């Protein structure tokens, strides 16, 4: 009986020691945990961004942080004691703003110095026809979103005939054919051919739409409206 009591007492004492040690370890760990503000400051300084959200995990061992900087939005997991970064994943990339047409033209002229003879644009790709001082002509394509030159190819004399006329030239042709004043001109593709549709205001308060082949400059159709 006495032996049994001693065994139980010893087991109880051992369990108590384990509980006390565990409590002390947890307490010490919690005392060493850095504050949210401290961890946030370190993360912002390290990655030159702004922390928009920071929460501590249930076990108090890590901080889950949302960071935004010029490169995008990141989900960061930081150690609560050392503030070391345990993991970092970009969840959203920043979509850079596209360059202006003036900036795109400047980039094209950097690649091929000369005089811009014609310029067209489809979506985010601007195309420039540039003539150099030696008389050679090049077609330069610029990706305005990526801010890079896609291609810069010399145009042969035969290919130059395929270069579209400008919007200004299309308006002049429409005015000459109708005797009115061109209001607007849109470049569209029809059955594989580029067509300028030019809206013209006529002297008798009427309007007309003139369709012009963008390659040849010939009038394909004129529609008069009341």
Curated annotation (Swiss-Prot):
It is a single-pass membrane protein. It comes from Bacillus subtilis (strain 168). One of its GO terms (cellular component) is plasma membrane. The keyword Cell membrane applies. Keywords: Cell membrane, Membrane, Transmembrane, Transmembrane helix. The lineage of its organism: Bacteria, Bacillati, Bacillota, Bacilli, Bacillales. Pfam families: PepSY. The keyword Nucleus does not apply. It is found in: Cell membrane. This is Uncharacterized membrane protein YkoI. The chain crosses the membrane at residues 5-25.
